[in-house]
Protein backbone atom coordinates (compact mmCIF):
# COMPACT_ATOMS: atom_id res chain seq x y z
CA UNK A 1 0.00 0.00 0.00
CA UNK A 2 1.22 3.47 -0.81
CA UNK A 3 2.27 5.73 2.02
CA UNK A 4 0.13 8.78 2.75
CA UNK A 5 2.12 12.04 2.44
CA UNK A 6 0.32 13.48 5.44
CA UNK A 7 2.08 10.91 7.62
CA UNK A 8 5.53 11.13 5.97
CA UNK A 9 6.99 13.20 8.83
CA UNK A 10 6.09 10.54 11.37
CA UNK A 11 8.23 7.63 12.48
CA UNK A 12 7.65 4.24 10.91
CA UNK A 13 7.92 1.01 12.84
CA UNK A 14 6.92 -2.57 12.24
CA UNK A 15 4.33 -4.00 14.61
CA UNK A 16 4.81 -7.62 15.70
CA UNK A 17 1.36 -8.01 17.29
CA UNK A 18 -1.15 -9.43 16.78
CA UNK A 19 0.12 -12.68 15.30
CA UNK A 20 -1.96 -14.53 12.71
CA UNK A 21 -1.93 -18.24 11.94
CA UNK A 22 -2.45 -17.94 8.17
CA UNK A 23 -2.15 -15.29 5.48
CA UNK A 24 -5.90 -15.68 4.82
CA UNK A 25 -6.71 -14.84 8.45
CA UNK A 26 -4.38 -11.84 8.25
CA UNK A 27 -6.05 -10.33 5.16
CA UNK A 28 -9.55 -11.18 6.40
CA UNK A 29 -8.90 -9.34 9.66
CA UNK A 30 -7.88 -6.06 7.99
CA UNK A 31 -10.66 -6.22 5.41
CA UNK A 32 -13.40 -7.05 7.91
CA UNK A 33 -12.49 -4.54 10.61
CA UNK A 34 -11.70 -1.46 8.55
CA UNK A 35 -14.02 0.71 10.66
CA UNK A 36 -12.48 -0.40 13.94
CA UNK A 37 -8.93 0.06 12.62
CA UNK A 38 -9.73 3.56 11.37
CA UNK A 39 -11.04 4.33 14.86
CA UNK A 40 -7.70 3.25 16.35
CA UNK A 41 -5.86 5.45 13.85
CA UNK A 42 -8.04 8.43 14.69
CA UNK A 43 -7.69 8.08 18.46
CA UNK A 44 -3.92 7.52 18.42
CA UNK A 45 -3.15 10.01 15.60
CA UNK A 46 -1.34 7.23 13.75
CA UNK A 47 -1.47 5.39 10.44
CA UNK A 48 -1.71 1.59 10.26
CA UNK A 49 -0.62 -0.12 7.03
CA UNK A 50 -0.26 -3.77 6.12
CA UNK A 51 1.35 -5.74 3.28
CA UNK A 52 -0.99 -8.34 1.85
CA UNK A 53 1.73 -10.77 0.73
CA UNK A 54 4.14 -10.68 3.67
CA UNK A 55 1.77 -10.33 6.67
CA UNK A 56 3.77 -7.31 7.85
CA UNK A 57 2.10 -4.50 9.81
CA UNK A 58 3.61 -0.99 9.92
CA UNK A 59 2.55 1.87 12.14
CA UNK A 60 3.36 5.53 11.52
CA UNK A 61 3.31 7.24 14.90
CA UNK A 62 4.15 10.55 16.59
CA UNK A 63 5.34 9.32 20.01
CA UNK A 64 6.33 5.91 21.44
CA UNK A 65 3.29 6.11 23.71
CA UNK A 66 0.98 6.32 20.68
CA UNK A 67 2.77 3.36 19.06
CA UNK A 68 2.26 1.22 22.17
CA UNK A 69 -1.41 2.24 22.36
CA UNK A 70 -2.02 1.40 18.71
CA UNK A 71 -0.29 -1.98 19.12
CA UNK A 72 -2.31 -2.89 22.22
CA UNK A 73 -5.50 -1.70 20.53
CA UNK A 74 -4.87 -3.99 17.55
CA UNK A 75 -4.21 -6.92 19.87
CA UNK A 76 -7.40 -6.19 21.84
CA UNK A 77 -9.38 -5.94 18.62
CA UNK A 78 -8.00 -9.28 17.47
CA UNK A 79 -8.71 -10.97 20.83
CA UNK A 80 -12.25 -9.62 20.93
CA UNK A 81 -13.29 -10.91 17.52
CA UNK A 82 -11.58 -14.29 17.19
CA UNK A 83 -12.27 -17.70 18.70
CA UNK A 84 -9.16 -17.41 20.86
CA UNK A 85 -10.31 -14.16 22.40
CA UNK A 86 -14.09 -14.40 22.41
CA UNK A 87 -16.65 -16.84 21.05
CA UNK A 88 -19.71 -15.70 19.14
CA UNK A 89 -21.92 -16.52 22.10
CA UNK A 90 -19.74 -14.45 24.41
CA UNK A 91 -19.72 -11.61 21.90
CA UNK A 92 -23.51 -11.66 21.74
CA UNK A 93 -23.70 -11.78 25.54
CA UNK A 94 -21.27 -8.86 25.75
CA UNK A 95 -23.54 -6.66 23.66
CA UNK A 96 -26.70 -7.76 25.47
CA UNK A 97 -25.65 -9.19 28.85
CA UNK A 98 -28.03 -11.55 30.53
CA UNK A 99 -29.14 -10.46 33.97
CA UNK A 100 -31.31 -13.38 35.12
CA UNK A 101 -30.33 -17.03 35.19
CA UNK A 102 -32.71 -19.94 35.98
CA UNK A 103 -30.42 -21.42 38.63
CA UNK A 104 -30.00 -18.07 40.35
CA UNK A 105 -33.73 -17.40 40.20
CA UNK A 106 -34.47 -20.79 41.76
CA UNK A 107 -31.88 -20.23 44.48
CA UNK A 108 -33.36 -16.80 45.19
CA UNK A 109 -36.86 -18.28 45.54
CA UNK A 110 -35.56 -20.96 47.91
CA UNK A 111 -33.74 -18.34 49.97
CA UNK A 112 -36.88 -16.20 50.29
CA UNK A 113 -38.90 -19.20 51.48
CA UNK A 114 -36.19 -20.19 53.95
CA UNK A 115 -35.91 -16.62 55.29
CA UNK A 116 -39.69 -16.44 55.68
CA UNK A 117 -39.69 -19.60 57.81
CA UNK A 118 -36.81 -18.33 59.94
CA UNK A 119 -38.52 -14.98 60.45
CA UNK A 120 -41.80 -16.65 61.38
CA UNK A 121 -39.99 -18.60 64.08
CA UNK A 122 -38.16 -15.64 65.60
CA UNK A 123 -41.20 -13.35 65.59
CA UNK A 124 -42.96 -15.60 68.11
CA UNK A 125 -43.27 -14.53 71.72
CA UNK A 126 -40.94 -16.80 73.68
CA UNK A 127 -41.48 -17.73 77.31
CA UNK A 128 -39.24 -15.37 79.36
CA UNK A 129 -38.29 -18.26 81.65
CA UNK A 130 -36.50 -20.08 78.84
CA UNK A 131 -32.73 -19.70 78.88
CA UNK A 132 -30.45 -19.24 75.87
CA UNK A 133 -26.73 -19.70 75.45
CA UNK A 134 -26.29 -16.02 74.55
CA UNK A 135 -28.37 -13.11 75.80
CA UNK A 136 -27.71 -9.38 75.66
CA UNK A 137 -29.22 -5.95 76.17
CA UNK A 138 -28.81 -2.74 74.25
CA UNK A 139 -29.87 0.07 76.56
CA UNK A 140 -31.28 3.14 74.87
CA UNK A 141 -29.36 6.32 75.76
CA UNK A 142 -32.64 8.26 75.83
CA UNK A 143 -36.13 7.15 76.88
CA UNK A 144 -38.04 10.02 75.25
CA UNK A 145 -38.51 8.06 72.03
CA UNK A 146 -41.61 6.07 71.08
CA UNK A 147 -39.87 2.85 70.08
CA UNK A 148 -42.96 1.08 68.75
CA UNK A 149 -43.84 4.04 66.54
CA UNK A 150 -40.46 4.41 64.86
CA UNK A 151 -39.22 0.80 64.75
CA UNK A 152 -42.16 -0.99 63.13
CA UNK A 153 -44.79 -1.57 65.80
CA UNK A 154 -44.83 -4.19 68.53
CA UNK A 155 -42.97 -6.70 66.35
CA UNK A 156 -40.16 -4.21 65.67
CA UNK A 157 -40.21 -5.05 61.97
CA UNK A 158 -37.23 -2.78 61.36
CA UNK A 159 -35.07 -5.55 62.87
CA UNK A 160 -36.49 -8.39 60.75
CA UNK A 161 -33.36 -8.76 58.63
CA UNK A 162 -31.25 -8.94 61.80
CA UNK A 163 -33.53 -11.72 63.09
CA UNK A 164 -33.06 -13.69 59.88
CA UNK A 165 -29.31 -13.19 59.48
CA UNK A 166 -28.40 -13.76 63.14
CA UNK A 167 -31.27 -16.17 63.98
CA UNK A 168 -32.16 -14.38 67.18
CA UNK A 169 -35.14 -13.09 69.15
CA UNK A 170 -35.37 -9.30 69.53
CA UNK A 171 -37.87 -7.70 71.92
CA UNK A 172 -38.23 -4.34 73.60
CA UNK A 173 -38.33 -4.07 77.40
CA UNK A 174 -40.14 -0.79 78.26
CA UNK A 175 -39.25 -0.88 81.96
CA UNK A 176 -35.55 -1.15 81.21
CA UNK A 177 -35.70 0.99 78.03
CA UNK A 178 -33.62 -1.63 76.24
CA UNK A 179 -33.68 -4.06 73.33
CA UNK A 180 -33.43 -7.67 74.52
CA UNK A 181 -31.57 -10.04 72.15
CA UNK A 182 -31.43 -13.83 72.67
CA UNK A 183 -29.89 -16.55 70.51
CA UNK A 184 -27.86 -19.75 70.67
CA UNK A 185 -24.55 -18.33 69.45
CA UNK A 186 -22.29 -15.81 71.16
CA UNK A 187 -20.91 -14.75 67.80
CA UNK A 188 -24.38 -14.09 66.42
CA UNK A 189 -25.26 -12.17 69.57
CA UNK A 190 -22.34 -9.77 69.13
CA UNK A 191 -23.26 -9.16 65.49
CA UNK A 192 -26.94 -8.70 66.31
CA UNK A 193 -26.27 -6.19 69.12
CA UNK A 194 -23.96 -4.23 66.87
CA UNK A 195 -26.53 -4.08 64.06
CA UNK A 196 -29.32 -3.16 66.47
CA UNK A 197 -27.17 -0.31 67.76
CA UNK A 198 -26.44 1.00 64.26
CA UNK A 199 -30.09 0.77 63.18
CA UNK A 200 -31.20 2.57 66.32
CA UNK A 201 -28.83 5.52 65.92
CA UNK A 202 -29.47 5.77 62.21
CA UNK A 203 -33.21 5.91 62.83
CA UNK A 204 -32.82 8.44 65.65
CA UNK A 205 -30.75 10.71 63.41
CA UNK A 206 -33.38 10.59 60.68
CA UNK A 207 -36.10 11.37 63.21
CA UNK A 208 -34.12 14.30 64.55
CA UNK A 209 -33.65 15.69 61.05
CA UNK A 210 -37.35 15.29 60.27
CA UNK A 211 -38.30 17.18 63.42
CA UNK A 212 -35.86 19.98 62.66
CA UNK A 213 -37.52 23.22 61.59
CA UNK A 214 -36.48 24.16 58.05
CA UNK A 215 -34.15 27.09 58.70
CA UNK A 216 -32.37 29.18 56.12
CA UNK A 217 -28.63 29.27 56.63
CA UNK A 218 -26.62 32.05 55.03
CA UNK A 219 -22.86 32.34 54.76
CA UNK A 220 -21.45 35.13 52.61
CA UNK A 221 -17.90 36.44 52.57
CA UNK A 222 -18.06 39.18 49.96
CA UNK A 223 -17.92 42.51 51.81
CA UNK A 224 -18.06 44.44 48.56
CA UNK A 225 -21.38 43.11 47.33
CA UNK A 226 -24.75 44.71 48.09
CA UNK A 227 -26.90 41.73 47.14
CA UNK A 228 -27.01 38.42 49.01
CA UNK A 229 -28.52 35.16 47.88
CA UNK A 230 -30.59 33.20 50.38
CA UNK A 231 -30.80 29.49 49.72
CA UNK A 232 -32.29 26.53 51.52
CA UNK A 233 -32.40 22.88 50.47
CA UNK A 234 -34.01 20.25 52.71
CA UNK A 235 -32.18 17.27 51.22
CA UNK A 236 -28.64 18.70 51.27
CA UNK A 237 -27.42 17.88 47.76
CA UNK A 238 -24.23 19.69 46.82
CA UNK A 239 -25.36 21.55 43.75
CA UNK A 240 -29.15 21.52 43.52
CA UNK A 241 -30.69 24.89 42.73
CA UNK A 242 -34.34 25.77 43.09
CA UNK A 243 -36.54 28.41 44.63
CA UNK A 244 -37.23 27.67 48.32
CA UNK A 245 -40.83 27.23 49.42
CA UNK A 246 -40.32 29.15 52.63
CA UNK A 247 -37.60 31.11 54.35
CA UNK A 248 -37.19 31.39 58.12
CA UNK A 249 -35.20 34.30 59.46
CA UNK A 250 -34.24 34.58 63.14
CA UNK A 251 -34.45 37.90 64.99
CA UNK A 252 -33.78 40.02 61.95
CA UNK A 253 -33.91 43.78 62.59
CA UNK A 254 -36.91 45.61 61.22
CA UNK A 255 -34.77 47.61 58.83
CA UNK A 256 -34.20 44.48 56.76
CA UNK A 257 -37.33 43.23 54.96
CA UNK A 258 -38.29 39.57 55.32
CA UNK A 259 -38.75 38.06 51.86
CA UNK A 260 -41.66 35.77 51.09
CA UNK A 261 -41.43 35.05 47.38
CA UNK A 262 -37.96 36.42 46.75
CA UNK A 263 -34.58 34.82 47.37
CA UNK A 264 -32.70 38.12 47.64
CA UNK A 265 -32.28 40.68 50.39
CA UNK A 266 -30.92 44.01 49.22
CA UNK A 267 -28.81 45.48 51.97
CA UNK A 268 -29.21 49.23 52.35
CA UNK A 269 -26.56 50.07 54.91
CA UNK A 270 -22.91 49.07 55.03
CA UNK A 271 -23.26 47.47 58.48
CA UNK A 272 -26.12 45.25 57.32
CA UNK A 273 -23.68 42.46 56.51
CA UNK A 274 -22.70 42.08 60.16
CA UNK A 275 -26.33 42.37 61.26
CA UNK A 276 -27.36 39.63 58.88
CA UNK A 277 -24.40 37.51 59.92
CA UNK A 278 -25.31 37.87 63.61
CA UNK A 279 -29.07 37.41 63.40
CA UNK A 280 -29.52 34.77 60.71
CA UNK A 281 -29.14 31.26 62.08
CA UNK A 282 -25.94 29.95 60.51
CA UNK A 283 -25.48 26.66 62.34
CA UNK A 284 -23.60 23.63 61.04
CA UNK A 285 -26.23 22.72 58.54
CA UNK A 286 -25.84 23.88 54.93
CA UNK A 287 -23.01 24.40 52.53
CA UNK A 288 -23.67 25.81 49.10
CA UNK A 289 -22.38 28.08 46.43
CA UNK A 290 -25.20 29.83 44.60
CA UNK A 291 -24.58 32.49 41.93
CA UNK A 292 -21.06 33.19 43.13
CA UNK A 293 -21.91 33.30 46.83
CA UNK A 294 -20.04 30.89 49.07
CA UNK A 295 -22.19 28.76 51.36
CA UNK A 296 -21.09 26.08 53.76
CA UNK A 297 -22.38 22.53 54.08
CA UNK A 298 -21.68 20.29 57.04
CA UNK A 299 -23.70 17.13 57.54
CA UNK A 300 -25.90 16.83 60.60
CA UNK A 301 -26.73 13.47 62.14
CA UNK A 302 -24.79 10.44 61.00
CA UNK A 303 -22.30 11.24 59.64
CA UNK A 304 -21.22 14.77 60.46
CA UNK A 305 -17.94 14.50 58.65
CA UNK A 306 -16.08 11.83 56.75
CA UNK A 307 -12.62 10.97 55.51
CA UNK A 308 -12.94 9.34 52.13
CA UNK A 309 -10.81 7.42 49.64
CA UNK A 310 -7.15 6.55 49.69
CA UNK A 311 -4.29 8.33 47.98
CA UNK A 312 -0.59 8.99 48.24
CA UNK A 313 0.64 12.39 49.37
CA UNK A 314 3.97 13.03 47.68
CA UNK A 315 5.34 16.35 48.87
CA UNK A 316 7.92 17.91 46.56
CA UNK A 317 8.31 21.18 48.45
CA UNK A 318 10.80 20.92 51.31
CA UNK A 319 9.20 23.76 53.26
CA UNK A 320 6.07 21.69 53.96
CA UNK A 321 7.59 19.97 56.97
CA UNK A 322 4.58 18.38 58.65
CA UNK A 323 3.24 16.71 55.53
CA UNK A 324 6.60 15.09 54.79
CA UNK A 325 6.13 12.68 57.69
CA UNK A 326 3.01 11.28 56.01
CA UNK A 327 4.34 10.07 52.69
CA UNK A 328 2.73 6.66 53.13
CA UNK A 329 -0.74 6.10 51.62
CA UNK A 330 -3.34 8.05 53.53
CA UNK A 331 -6.83 9.32 53.02
CA UNK A 332 -8.05 12.06 50.76
CA UNK A 333 -10.61 13.88 52.78
CA UNK A 334 -13.40 16.41 52.95
CA UNK A 335 -14.83 18.14 55.95
CA UNK A 336 -15.74 21.63 54.85
CA UNK A 337 -16.51 21.94 51.17
CA UNK A 338 -17.27 25.16 49.39
CA UNK A 339 -18.52 25.33 45.83
CA UNK A 340 -17.30 28.01 43.45
CA UNK A 341 -18.46 29.11 40.03
CA UNK A 342 -16.20 28.20 37.10
CA UNK A 343 -14.90 31.72 36.54
CA UNK A 344 -14.06 32.26 40.20
CA UNK A 345 -12.33 28.88 40.52
CA UNK A 346 -10.10 29.38 37.49
CA UNK A 347 -9.06 32.77 38.80
CA UNK A 348 -8.47 31.43 42.31
CA UNK A 349 -6.02 28.81 41.00
CA UNK A 350 -3.99 31.59 39.35
CA UNK A 351 -3.89 34.04 42.25
CA UNK A 352 -3.28 31.80 45.27
CA UNK A 353 0.49 31.67 44.81
CA UNK A 354 0.72 35.46 44.54
CA UNK A 355 -1.51 36.29 47.52
CA UNK A 356 0.23 38.29 50.26
CA UNK A 357 -0.77 39.39 53.74
CA UNK A 358 -0.97 43.12 54.63
CA UNK A 359 2.59 42.80 55.96
CA UNK A 360 3.79 41.32 52.67
CA UNK A 361 4.09 37.72 53.85
CA UNK A 362 3.17 34.83 51.59
CA UNK A 363 -0.21 33.27 52.42
CA UNK A 364 -0.25 30.04 50.40
CA UNK A 365 2.29 27.55 49.20
CA UNK A 366 1.61 24.97 46.51
CA UNK A 367 2.31 21.29 47.14
CA UNK A 368 3.13 20.75 43.48
CA UNK A 369 3.01 22.57 40.17
CA UNK A 370 0.99 19.73 38.65
CA UNK A 371 -2.49 18.86 39.93
CA UNK A 372 -3.33 15.42 41.24
CA UNK A 373 -5.54 13.68 38.67
CA UNK A 374 -8.06 11.05 39.73
CA UNK A 375 -10.30 9.26 37.22
CA UNK A 376 -13.23 7.17 38.47
CA UNK A 377 -14.18 4.54 35.87
CA UNK A 378 -17.65 3.06 36.30
CA UNK A 379 -17.14 -0.37 34.75
CA UNK A 380 -19.20 -3.49 34.13
CA UNK A 381 -17.52 -6.88 33.87
CA UNK A 382 -18.58 -9.89 31.80
CA UNK A 383 -20.76 -11.17 34.66
CA UNK A 384 -22.84 -8.01 34.67
CA UNK A 385 -21.36 -6.78 37.96
CA UNK A 386 -20.81 -3.04 38.19
CA UNK A 387 -17.91 -1.52 40.08
CA UNK A 388 -15.90 1.68 40.25
CA UNK A 389 -12.19 1.62 39.53
CA UNK A 390 -10.17 4.70 40.43
CA UNK A 391 -6.82 5.55 38.85
CA UNK A 392 -4.63 8.28 40.35
CA UNK A 393 -1.83 10.28 38.74
CA UNK A 394 0.64 12.39 40.75
CA UNK A 395 2.20 13.60 37.49
CA UNK A 396 0.65 15.11 34.38
CA UNK A 397 1.25 12.12 32.07
CA UNK A 398 2.17 8.45 31.87
CA UNK A 399 0.82 5.47 33.78
CA UNK A 400 -1.28 5.86 36.95
CA UNK A 401 0.71 5.99 40.17
CA UNK A 402 -1.99 4.03 41.99
CA UNK A 403 -5.41 2.47 41.65
CA UNK A 404 -8.09 0.76 43.71
CA UNK A 405 -11.54 -0.80 43.43
CA UNK A 406 -14.44 0.55 45.45
CA UNK A 407 -15.71 -2.99 46.12
CA UNK A 408 -12.39 -4.04 47.70
CA UNK A 409 -12.14 -1.12 50.09
CA UNK A 410 -12.52 -1.83 53.78
CA UNK A 411 -12.89 0.32 56.86
CA UNK A 412 -9.74 0.47 58.93
CA UNK A 413 -11.31 2.65 61.58
CA UNK A 414 -14.88 3.52 62.47
CA UNK A 415 -15.63 5.79 65.42
CA UNK A 416 -19.06 7.27 66.04
CA UNK A 417 -19.91 9.92 68.58
CA UNK A 418 -23.62 10.06 69.43
CA UNK A 419 -25.42 12.95 71.05
CA UNK A 420 -29.17 12.72 70.64
CA UNK A 421 -29.79 16.30 71.70
CA UNK A 422 -27.32 18.19 69.50
CA UNK A 423 -24.90 16.94 66.85
CA UNK A 424 -23.45 13.54 66.12
CA UNK A 425 -20.56 12.59 63.94
CA UNK A 426 -19.02 9.56 62.37
CA UNK A 427 -15.36 9.30 61.41
CA UNK A 428 -14.04 6.44 59.32
CA UNK A 429 -11.12 5.72 57.06
CA UNK A 430 -11.50 3.56 53.97
CA UNK A 431 -8.49 1.91 52.38
CA UNK A 432 -8.42 0.37 48.94
CA UNK A 433 -6.30 -2.60 47.98
CA UNK A 434 -6.19 -4.42 44.61
CA UNK A 435 -7.96 -7.71 45.08
CA UNK A 436 -5.98 -10.90 44.60
CA UNK A 437 -8.49 -12.19 42.04
CA UNK A 438 -8.60 -9.07 39.88
CA UNK A 439 -6.78 -10.35 36.79
CA UNK A 440 -9.23 -8.63 34.48
CA UNK A 441 -8.91 -5.36 36.38
CA UNK A 442 -5.11 -5.56 36.40
CA UNK A 443 -5.18 -6.04 32.63
CA UNK A 444 -7.54 -3.10 32.32
CA UNK A 445 -5.38 -0.83 34.50
CA UNK A 446 -2.23 -1.81 32.59
CA UNK A 447 -3.72 -0.23 29.46
CA UNK A 448 -4.60 3.10 31.11
CA UNK A 449 -2.34 6.05 30.38
CA UNK A 450 -2.47 9.82 30.08
CA UNK A 451 -0.71 11.98 27.50
CA UNK A 452 0.91 15.37 28.06
CA UNK A 453 -2.05 17.16 26.48
CA UNK A 454 -4.60 15.66 28.92
CA UNK A 455 -5.85 12.72 26.87
CA UNK A 456 -6.84 9.67 28.92
CA UNK A 457 -6.47 6.35 27.07
CA UNK A 458 -7.99 3.04 28.16
CA UNK A 459 -9.21 -0.22 26.62
CA UNK A 460 -12.67 -1.73 26.61
CA UNK A 461 -12.05 -5.48 26.61
CA UNK A 462 -14.24 -8.55 26.26
CA UNK A 463 -14.27 -8.77 30.07
CA UNK A 464 -14.61 -5.13 31.14
CA UNK A 465 -16.20 -2.11 29.56
CA UNK A 466 -16.50 1.45 30.84
CA UNK A 467 -19.96 2.97 31.18
CA UNK A 468 -18.96 6.42 32.43
CA UNK A 469 -16.04 8.25 33.99
CA UNK A 470 -15.45 11.16 36.34
CA UNK A 471 -12.25 13.22 36.14
CA UNK A 472 -11.03 15.16 39.18
CA UNK A 473 -8.15 17.62 39.03
CA UNK A 474 -7.05 18.60 42.54
CA UNK A 475 -4.72 21.52 43.27
CA UNK A 476 -3.32 21.27 46.81
CA UNK A 477 -2.13 24.29 48.77
CA UNK A 478 -0.73 24.90 52.21
CA UNK A 479 -2.15 27.85 54.18
CA UNK A 480 1.00 28.87 56.02
CA UNK A 481 -0.46 30.81 58.94
CA UNK A 482 -3.16 28.30 59.96
CA UNK A 483 -1.46 25.12 58.78
CA UNK A 484 -4.60 23.93 56.96
CA UNK A 485 -4.52 22.07 53.69
CA UNK A 486 -6.68 23.70 51.03
CA UNK A 487 -7.80 21.68 48.01
CA UNK A 488 -9.37 23.19 44.90
CA UNK A 489 -10.90 20.39 42.84
CA UNK A 490 -12.38 20.41 39.36
CA UNK A 491 -15.08 17.76 38.78
CA UNK A 492 -15.96 16.62 35.26
CA UNK A 493 -18.22 13.71 34.26
CA UNK A 494 -18.81 11.91 30.95
CA UNK A 495 -21.16 9.09 29.88
CA UNK A 496 -19.57 6.91 27.23
CA UNK A 497 -21.22 7.23 23.83
CA UNK A 498 -23.81 9.79 24.99
CA UNK A 499 -22.25 12.93 23.44
CA UNK A 500 -22.12 12.97 19.63
CA UNK A 501 -19.19 15.37 19.41
CA UNK A 502 -16.99 13.19 21.64
CA UNK A 503 -15.43 10.07 20.12
CA UNK A 504 -16.30 7.44 22.77
CA UNK A 505 -18.41 4.28 22.72
CA UNK A 506 -19.04 0.95 24.51
CA UNK A 507 -17.37 -1.29 21.94
CA UNK A 508 -14.22 -3.31 22.72
CA UNK A 509 -11.05 -1.51 21.79
CA UNK A 510 -9.14 1.67 22.44
CA UNK A 511 -11.01 4.59 24.00
CA UNK A 512 -9.76 8.14 24.36
CA UNK A 513 -11.20 10.98 26.42
CA UNK A 514 -9.83 14.51 26.32
CA UNK A 515 -10.04 16.21 29.72
CA UNK A 516 -12.24 19.27 29.37
CA UNK A 517 -14.20 18.05 26.34
CA UNK A 518 -17.45 17.30 28.23
CA UNK A 519 -18.56 20.24 30.36
CA UNK A 520 -22.21 19.18 30.71
CA UNK A 521 -21.51 18.14 34.32
CA UNK A 522 -18.80 20.45 35.61
CA UNK A 523 -18.24 21.99 39.02
CA UNK A 524 -15.48 23.18 41.30
CA UNK A 525 -15.00 22.52 44.99
CA UNK A 526 -12.89 23.93 47.78
CA UNK A 527 -12.21 21.74 50.81
CA UNK A 528 -10.18 22.03 54.01
CA UNK A 529 -8.25 19.52 56.08
CA UNK A 530 -6.33 19.99 59.30
CA UNK A 531 -3.07 17.96 59.01
CA UNK A 532 -2.95 17.64 62.80
CA UNK A 533 -5.73 15.07 62.46
CA UNK A 534 -3.25 12.80 60.70
CA UNK A 535 -1.23 12.61 63.90
CA UNK A 536 -4.33 11.51 65.81
CA UNK A 537 -5.15 8.83 63.24
CA UNK A 538 -1.71 7.61 62.18
CA UNK A 539 -1.54 4.97 64.91
CA UNK A 540 -5.04 3.73 64.14
CA UNK A 541 -5.04 3.47 60.36
CA UNK A 542 -4.63 -0.33 60.34
CA UNK A 543 -7.09 -1.11 63.12
CA UNK A 544 -10.21 -3.05 62.30
CA UNK A 545 -13.71 -1.77 62.90
CA UNK A 546 -14.17 -3.68 66.16
CA UNK A 547 -10.90 -2.46 67.70
CA UNK A 548 -10.97 0.56 70.00
CA UNK A 549 -8.86 3.56 68.89
CA UNK A 550 -5.93 4.80 70.91
CA UNK A 551 -7.57 8.19 71.41
CA UNK A 552 -10.87 9.23 72.94
CA UNK A 553 -13.59 9.54 70.28
CA UNK A 554 -14.56 13.05 71.33
CA UNK A 555 -15.08 16.19 69.30
CA UNK A 556 -12.55 17.94 71.55
CA UNK A 557 -9.84 15.58 70.26
CA UNK A 558 -10.26 16.85 66.71
CA UNK A 559 -11.43 20.37 67.53
CA UNK A 560 -9.64 21.41 70.74
CA UNK A 561 -10.69 25.03 70.14
CA UNK A 562 -14.19 24.08 69.05
CA UNK A 563 -15.84 23.39 65.71
CA UNK A 564 -16.83 27.05 65.48
CA UNK A 565 -13.18 28.13 65.57
CA UNK A 566 -12.30 25.67 62.82
CA UNK A 567 -15.12 26.97 60.64
CA UNK A 568 -14.29 30.62 61.32
CA UNK A 569 -10.67 29.99 60.34
CA UNK A 570 -11.79 28.32 57.12
CA UNK A 571 -14.17 31.19 56.45
CA UNK A 572 -11.42 33.76 56.93
CA UNK A 573 -9.33 31.93 54.33
CA UNK A 574 -12.26 31.96 51.92
CA UNK A 575 -12.73 35.69 52.53
CA UNK A 576 -9.10 36.36 51.62
CA UNK A 577 -9.37 34.25 48.48
CA UNK A 578 -12.72 35.77 47.51
CA UNK A 579 -11.38 39.32 47.88
CA UNK A 580 -8.47 38.47 45.61
CA UNK A 581 -10.86 37.55 42.80
CA UNK A 582 -12.49 40.97 43.00
CA UNK A 583 -9.33 43.08 43.15
Swiss-Prot record:
InterPro entries recorded: DUF7905 (IPR057227)
GO cellular component, one term: pericentric heterochromatin
BP GO annotations: silent mating-type cassette heterochromatin formation; siRNA-mediated pericentric heterochromatin formation
UniProt protein name: Uncharacterized protein C582.04c
Species this chain originates from: Schizosaccharomyces pombe (strain 972 / ATCC 24843) (Fission yeast)
Amino acid sequence: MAENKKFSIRKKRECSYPTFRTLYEFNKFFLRYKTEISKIQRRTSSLIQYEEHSSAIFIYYETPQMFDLATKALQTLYNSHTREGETKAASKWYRNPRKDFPSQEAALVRKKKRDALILKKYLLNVDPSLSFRAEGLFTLPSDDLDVYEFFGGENLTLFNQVRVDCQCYIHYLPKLAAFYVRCDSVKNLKVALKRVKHIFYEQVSLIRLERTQPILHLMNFDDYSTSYELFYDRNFPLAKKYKPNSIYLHRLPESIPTPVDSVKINLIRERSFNLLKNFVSASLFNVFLFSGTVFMRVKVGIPLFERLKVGTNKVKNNSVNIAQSFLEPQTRSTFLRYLFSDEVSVKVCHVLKELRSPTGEKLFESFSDDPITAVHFEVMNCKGVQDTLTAIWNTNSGKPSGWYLESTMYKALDVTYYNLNTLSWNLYIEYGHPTQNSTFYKEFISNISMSDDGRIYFMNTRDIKVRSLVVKLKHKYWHLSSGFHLHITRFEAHDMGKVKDIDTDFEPGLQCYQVGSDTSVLRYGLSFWDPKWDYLLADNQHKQQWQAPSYKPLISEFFPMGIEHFIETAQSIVMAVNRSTID
